Amino acid sequence: IADKAGAYPSELSGGQKQRAAIARALASDPEILLCDEATSALDPQTTEAILKLLKKLNAQLGLTIVLITHQMNVVKEICTRTAVMENGRVVEQGDVFEIFANPQEKVTRSFVDTTSSLSGINTLIEEKSPLVQLKPGQKILRFKYLERSACEALVSTISRRFNIDLNIIFGSIEIIGDNPIGGLVVIADGKEDDIRDAVKYLCDINVGVEVILSA
């Protein structure tokens, strides 16, 4: 933005204003950089550029960055630790991976759901989509990988071991803090006892299981 040195603020784009604000803050050689809604109202490309800049500053300058945001995708992209606040108090805090893998508080779960395609199952159920019209004995299950490994072939393992048919509705795997985290929403079709044993097995290997709907 050196070519904008003589420009008025009104002549700058949102991204240029943010870069200027960051440069101004760095002029005093701080140990901590406070960024309050640093990506608010920016387009996706500019948001990505600002986050890359902040990550570069953190790595090259050893700068601690405190980021205030309502955008959980931003938290997922750049942060190593996070604190969730509600009504002016911290209700949950910890490692970003653990917060996304196993949120404890209702407000945290609602924030995390905004970043996951798996939450689309709730819309399908509300709209009574044909995709979620269950036959007798079927269940809709949501799996969530809680370990720092999301590589096990769960669907084939469960199907073979417990003689259950699993139809995948939603699935996702993403990287948070250099660790994979994944989830599936499936329709399980089989004997009640077999499904119950499968759920117990998944819990035993630290895969979170939620029964969303039963027929």
Give a label for each model feature:
Residues 33-36:
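Catalytic Walker B motif of ABC-type/P-loop ATPase nucleotide-binding domains
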Residues 8-12, 16:
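Conserved ABC ATPase signature
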